Curated annotation (Swiss-Prot):
Protein name in the entry: Uncharacterized membrane protein X69R
Phylogenetic placement of the source organism: Viruses, Varidnaviria, Bamfordvirae, Nucleocytoviricota, Pokkesviricetes
Bilayer disposition of the protein: Single-pass membrane protein
UniProt main location, coarse: host cell
Family note: Belongs to the asfivirus X69R family.
Glycosylation positions in this chain: 53
Positions in coiled-coil regions: none
Side Cytoplasmic, residues: 1-16
Cellular location(s): Host membrane
Amino acid sequence: MLLLYTVMILTCIIYKLVPDNKYWPIHMFFFIMIYIVYMYEKLDIHEKSQFWNYTMARLSGHPVPTIICNC
């Protein structure tokens, strides 16, 4: 959550510092991508596999299989 606040603060600072403010959505996009990559890297190998399976299924329009854990 702290990283999310950091991204928001940095985006606001860049929005104020950039003389031509028409590029602030591009900066926001890159900060969000960095945040997603950071969160992905925190996952272990099994969670990464499930993450990509879920993402690819959603992007291709196929129904997402329900994962049932019998722990």
